[in-house]
């Protein structure tokens, strides 16, 4: 499939550029609970002056691509940000349709009221679903395009796990996806989007071409690190940037959305309306991706083997270890509250273990009511909404520390961002400490543990509810060879063949190993 769009506007003379700023950012897992209005309110849902104030903050609550875009625009010359609306939620289930309809209508109204504009910047994940629509990202972009007209530049930044659709690329003038995983280049991508916007304003239309492949690599196989196939492909794509080619984005996609736009996408943006150059390169790179598909393999460690490794790590002389509970990753729609690994570690008597972060608002509230030093029976998942995976578990515990959960990211993906876990508590269950939080999220930064008084030097095994983003922030705790991705059940399992697919286009590799594709 090949899709394209053009868009251009003359550069204004003698005045500041007026750039509309908006965003809709969520990654949706088909099998996770519906994401409601409250899910966005817990993370970020602001508009107008409030959004403008965040853009101006040194440590904004916004995603770093927004800060990077704003900084690059300011450095390039006079500009006036026109804040519209920014809605961000933790990865979860399909978005409530009523909320999404209201969001789109609000952005449309704000766009009309903001006229005249010179361009629009969108901060997007690109893998959203709603309860009634499998391509809300494309719908939103199309509605924005309809308001501003065919010639105004619209530039957007995406997660590299975006599920790209024709409607998405058709509405855009430039497409920029992250090139790191863990995602540490959000700010740089925002800066790049600003450069492309200036290029399009000065030189004319941008062209976006996309080639989709019947290939859904597991999330754990999409690590961008030395020696990985994804790193090789992204590096190859970057060698082709230059001349008419503004950007090459290689998007592995998010299979757990289970929708017809799932699949690896090669997206190329070219300047000067050079559609031929963009399409030719997209097809060439797609051929290379397809030839390398067999190298995207997920390597999981059996639970018993992982627990044994933790027991050994807790003995004198044991080396630090990270166990990644990848099947319960809040960063892909997991609840962050499965207990299989926790129970196994406690039962085995493992020492020096810290599990972070476990989402259980009721348990956090009870710990706050009890106070530091209190001993009580910790009842995990007492009112679980996920009886399949988030099973109840009770154990004697002691409250070690309490916090309001507000932290400023220090390293990796959320460095410099002010975020909140809500009321949080550090509990001790024998040799296992558990960081319990109220607002669901994955472990991304040491600050999430340090606000609870944790000294990582006292930890022998760190259990993370995360798929991979922790690697960018905890690289000094344990080297890659001491990270085990544990094979447990959960909503975000990378064992794709175990999932009840209903909307995934078939055949698709690796679900169907005989899937075929040709550039012709």
Q: What function would you assign to each model-found segment?
A:
Residues 201-229:
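Internal, active-site/partner-interface "lid" segment
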Residues 70-110:
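Low-complexity, highly charged intrinsically disordered N-terminal segments
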Residues 10-16, 75-77, 83, 109-118, ...:
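Glycine-rich phosphate/diphosphate-binding loops that line cofactor/substrate pockets in enzymes
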Residues 220-430, 435-439:
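Hard-cation-handling environments
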Residues 3-72:
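N-terminal amphipathic/basic leader segments beginning at the initiator methionine
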Residues 290, 407-520:
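Extended hydrophobic packing segments that form well-structured cores
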Residues 17-27, 31-33, 41, 95-104, ...:
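Active-site histidine-anchored catalytic micro-motif
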Residues 74, 78, 109-112, 116, ...:
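Generic secondary-structure signature for well-ordered alpha-helical cores
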């Amino acid at each position: 499939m090949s899709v394209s769009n053009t868009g251009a506007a003359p550069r204004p003379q003698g005045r500041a550029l007026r750039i509309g700023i908006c965003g809709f950012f969520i990654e949706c897992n088909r099998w996770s609970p519906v994401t409601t209005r409250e899910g966005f309110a817990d993370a970020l849902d602001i508009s107008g002056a409030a959004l403008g104030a965040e853009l101006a903050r040194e440590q904004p609550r916004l995603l770093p691509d927004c800060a990077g875009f704003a900084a690059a625009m300011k450095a390039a010359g006079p500009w006036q940000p026109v804040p519209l609306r920014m809605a961000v939620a933790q990865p979860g289930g399909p978005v409530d349709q009523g909320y999404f309809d209201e969001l789109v209508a609000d952005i449309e109204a704000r766009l009309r009221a903001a006229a005249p504009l010179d361009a629009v910047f969108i901060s997007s994940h690109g893998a959203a679903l709603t309860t009634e629509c499998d391509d809300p990202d494309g719908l939103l972009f199309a509605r924005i395009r309809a308001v501003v007209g065919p010639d105004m530049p619209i530039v957007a930044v995406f997660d590299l796990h975006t599920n790209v659709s024709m409607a998405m690329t058709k509405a855009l003038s430039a497409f920029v996806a992250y090139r790191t995983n863990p995602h540490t280049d959000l700010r740089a991508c925002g800066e790049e989007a600003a450069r492309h916007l200036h290029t399009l304003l000065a030189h004319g239309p941008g062209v976006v071409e996309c080639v989709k492949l019947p290939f859904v690599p597991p999330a754990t196989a999409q690590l961008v690190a030395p020696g990985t196939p994804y790193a090789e492909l992204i590096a190859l794509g970057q060698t082709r940037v230059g001349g008419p080619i503004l950007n090459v984005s290689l998007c592995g996609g998010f299979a757990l959305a289970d929708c017809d736009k799932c699949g690896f996408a090669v997206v190329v943006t070219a300047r000067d309306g050079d559609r031929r150059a963009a399409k030719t390169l997209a097809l060439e790179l797609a051929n290379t991706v397809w030839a390398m598909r067999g190298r995207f393999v997920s390597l999981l460690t059996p639970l018993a083997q992982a627990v044994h490794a933790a027991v050994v790590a807790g003995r004198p002389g044991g080396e630090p270890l990270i166990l990644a509970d990848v099947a319960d990753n809040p960063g892909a729609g997991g609840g962050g509250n499965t207990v299989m690994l926790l129970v196994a570690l406690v039962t085995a008597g493992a020492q020096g273990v810290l599990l972070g972060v476990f989402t259980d608002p009721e348990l956090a509230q009870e710990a706050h009511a009890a106070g530091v030093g209190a001993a009580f029976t910790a009842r995990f998942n007492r009112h679980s909404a996920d009886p399949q995976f988030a099973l109840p578990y009770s154990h004697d515990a002691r409250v070690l520390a309490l916090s309001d959960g507000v932290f400023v990211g220090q390293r990796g993906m959320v460095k410099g961002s002010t975020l909140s876990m809500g009321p949080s508590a550090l509990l001790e269950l024998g040799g296992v400490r558990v960081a319990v939080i109220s607002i669901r999220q994955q472990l991304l930064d040491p600050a999430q543990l340090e606000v609870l008084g944790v000294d990582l030097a006292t930890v022998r095994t760190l259990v993370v509810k995360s798929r991979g983003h922790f690697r960018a922030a905890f690289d000094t705790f344990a080297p890659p060879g001491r990270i085990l991705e544990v094979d447990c059940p959960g909503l975000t399992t990378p064992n794709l063949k175990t999932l009840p697919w209903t909307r995934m286009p078939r055949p698709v590799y690796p679900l169907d190993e005989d899937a075929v594709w040709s550039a012709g």
